[in-house]
Amino acid sequence: VNARGGAGGKPIELVTLDDANDRKTAGANTQKLLTANNAVALFGYASATLSLDAMPQADKAGVLFFAPFSGANPVRQAPPVVFTVRASYADELEKMLAFWTGLGAKQVVVVHYDDEVGKQNLAVVVEYLKKQAKTPAAFSIARNAKLDASNFAQLMALKPDVIISTVLSGPAAEISKQIVARGSFVPTSSLSFVGAQQYIAAAGEAAAGVSITQVVPNPSSRAPIVTECAKAMQEAGMTQPMNSTHLEACIGAKVLTEAMRRAKKPGDARSLLAAMQNLGRYDTGGFVVNYAPGQNHGSKFVELAMVSRDGKLRN
């Protein structure tokens, strides 16, 4: 964008601060970005937890808070300055539950974190299955906790027909490896939150057969936005293959710069916020977002993909 003269004739400056995956640090960084750096938009916070202390600050300042990497309720039910480019976790969970219950699964076990977001994910499953007179079993774990053989035994004692995993790649991969090591087979689906490529790398051969929801096109597809983002990242010096997280970030960046281009006052936070609110339907190149006053969540796109034996994600 800057190579073409910027947005509205003004170059875009990207200021990046490391939050070390810590909520308090993310909140402190937000204050610095809003005060010392006079940010006109906050972009790409890595989770709902890291967004919790940042969103109220953005709301108070009237600054756009755009494209957090989360579909959790705290982000979906956030202040009016918060806009997303991805489907909600509820959308993802309903997609996988419709698939498995349609195949006759009765005992659904939800693996979730024992925090606010994890409990909300469990609640979505409870509400969905209530319509079918079913009740899921819950298996909660602490964030950053290591799973051992006793944890796995507790999980398997729940006798799952299917495991719905809402945790990150580390524990999700450990569960898959434990299942395979014991000669068992339990159908498993993970939220996009797992990080598909990170999970596949961590689980190795044990990832085969696991399904993962995707909220952006497959990074190996021929969608124009995939080609465009892969080229942009290569030109930026990235050597590893583009994954779903990279693609989601790139889509977010394209939508954000389009709103900047349409803003009536380039470089003005409130003008940018108004441009985003009135962006309407925007096709990024095979991935469509749609915003309007009162409609801050641009997409409900969800696909269910499966990991093949060669470690590829297949739709």
Label every PLM stretch briefly.
Residues 33-46, 66-68, 109-112, 159-169, ...:
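Periplasmic-binding protein-like
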Residues 176-250, 307, 313-314:
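Extracellular/periplasmic periplasmic-binding protein-like sensory domains
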Residues 28, 72-74, 80-183, 219-227:
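Extracellular/periplasmic Venus flytrap/periplasmic-binding protein
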Residues 1-8, 124-128:
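Short, polar/charged alpha-helical segment
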Residues 235-247, 257-313:
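Segments of small-molecule ligand-sensing domains
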Residues 4-76, 141-148, 170-173:
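Beta-alpha junction/loop-to-helix N-cap segments that form part of ligand/metal-binding clefts
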Residues 9-12, 37-41, 60-64, 78-81, ...:
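Loop/turn elements at helix/coil->beta-strand transitions in domains of secreted/extracellular proteins
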